[in-house]
UniProtKB/Swiss-Prot annotation:
UniProt-listed GO biological process terms: post-translational protein targeting to endoplasmic reticulum membrane
Listed name of the protein: Small glutamine-rich tetratricopeptide repeat-containing protein 2
Chain intervals with Low complexity compositional bias: 80-97
Repeat (TPR) residue spans along the chain: 105-138, 140-172, 173-206
PANTHER family: LD24721P (PTHR45831:SF2)
Amino acid sequence: MSQQTPLAYAVAQWLQQSSTSVPADQKAKLQQAAKSVSEAFGVDTSSAEQQAQYGSGPGLQAIFDIFLKTQAKMGAAPAPAAASSSSTAPAAAAATPSDEDLAKAEQLKAEGNKAMSAKDYGAAIEAYGKAIELNPNSPVYFSNRAAAFSQIGQHDSAIDDAKQASKIDPKFGKAYSRLGHALFSSGRYQEAVEAYQKGVEVDPSNEVLKKGLAASKEQLSSSSSSNANDATASRGAADAVSAPSAGADAGAGAGGFPNFGGGAGGMPDLAAMMNNPMIAQMAQNLMSNPDSLASLMNNPMLRQAAERFGSGGGMPDMSSMMNDPALRDMARNFMGGAGRGAGGNGGNNMYG
């Protein structure tokens, strides 16, 4: 095995993975590039044997991210010979963007905003990234890219960008909104509370931050007692399954969805659901928007509910799930509603 083989495999794998989050006209180019690398070095990313041999590591993107973070930390460290008066100067001060770069960065930001409105999140991430390259001192660019990362479920990247935005400008309230949203969506409720709390301190009149803080506190309280309630909930679900049905309303109350006839054990009547125009529209939007579908499936609360239901734990508590601002945001979006939930990436919390 050549020493280049693992690297070639990682490059081909990264190209294929990247093709899922770019515009259609760029997808074919990335796939062709992956094919060329695979053929040139004799690697096959679809091979289970090569996957086990070369693909068990963290991946090329993760390794590169670690390199960038390490480089940033080393670059931010004060030089031993530096004068004390310069030790407090920002690291970026030596590379102040030119007026031309600033204007181009603003143009790229506008392109990213337009892509966000069109739900083309891959293009938005690319545009904001180019703007950051030209002007890394703008908290808005990092904040906007954090919103785009959240939309496709890349919450770790969103957290990094939101933290960088707050580091550049500690009084930029929207950075804490992005950070709280990404932390909440990752199931890190205590950290989400802290992020939203900091945001409320710097921007007391921001209703999005207040709602996000309230939702995070409620979810933190709920999640802290969920383990104690799991056994009781399972017994209650078993009783509901064995109890005789008292009609459609009883089915809905026994763990089913509201406003739909309940089937056995509180399961919703799927035929009735698909006859509902809002549910039909939501299903259609899900099928036509793979990025949002990926974000939905990455939501920790929804994933936990699905796992609990699959193991016989009964239907999830829909009212509790709708307290998750990320789920509420996506539900309104899929059903054609205007505005977003607390802590989300829309409504009064639009990108800059």
